[in-house]
């Protein structure tokens, strides 16, 4: 199901209509020349009959909180090794930059 149906339905609710019909949602979508699949829209409207939009949003947020991020904490030892390696690489890069600067100034300066 496309989010356009959800958005149009919620726009109707925000406009003061707690239970918008298929026709009203079609009018909202028609205002922006969106394609409407009648079967999908009818199924969506039927699934929301008798339900409050605010309750659905609250229930959905609770479900999202239970899902979690799916990211596990990295071991602290691995992070320390990575930072030490990064510091070594930074020092090498700094030395290379200093050498390049010294090579650039070989007395061939036009203005100094």
From Swiss-Prot:
It holds the Pfam family Ribosomal_60s. Gene3D superfamilies: 1.10.10.1410. Residues 96-106 have a biased composition (Acidic residues). Residues 84-95 have a biased composition (Basic and acidic residues). The keyword Phosphoprotein applies. InterPro entries: P1/P2_N_sf (IPR038716), Ribosomal_P1/P2 (IPR027534), Ribosomal_P2 (IPR044076). Phosphorylated. One of its GO terms (cellular component) is cytosolic large ribosomal subunit. One of its GO terms (molecular function) is structural constituent of ribosome. Keywords: Phosphoprotein, Ribonucleoprotein, Ribosomal protein. One of its GO terms (biological process) is cytoplasmic translational elongation. Transmembrane segments: none annotated. Residues 81-112 are annotated as: Disordered. Belongs to the eukaryotic ribosomal protein P1/P2 family. PANTHER family: 60S ACIDIC RIBOSOMAL PROTEIN FAMILY MEMBER (PTHR21141), LARGE RIBOSOMAL SUBUNIT PROTEIN P2 (PTHR21141:SF5). P1 and P2 exist as dimers at the large ribosomal subunit. Plays an important role in the elongation step of protein synthesis. This is Large ribosomal subunit protein P2. The lineage of its organism: Eukaryota, Sar, Alveolata, Apicomplexa, Aconoidasida. The gene is MAL3P3.19.
């Amino acid at each position: 199901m496309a989010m356009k149906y959800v958005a149009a339905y919620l726009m109707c609710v925000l406009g003061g209509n707690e239970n918008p019909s298929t026709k009203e949602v079609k009018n909202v979508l028609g205002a922006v020349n969106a394609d409407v699949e009648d079967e999908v829209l009818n199924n969506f409207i039927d699934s929301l009959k008798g339900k409050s939009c605010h309750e659905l949003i609250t229930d959905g947020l609770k479900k999202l909180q239970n899902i979690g991020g799916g990211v596990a904490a990295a071991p602290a030892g691995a992070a320390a090794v990575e930072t030490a390696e990064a510091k070594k690489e930074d020092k090498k890069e700094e030395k290379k930059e200093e050498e390049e600067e010294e090579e650039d100034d070989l007395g061939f300066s036009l203005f100094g």
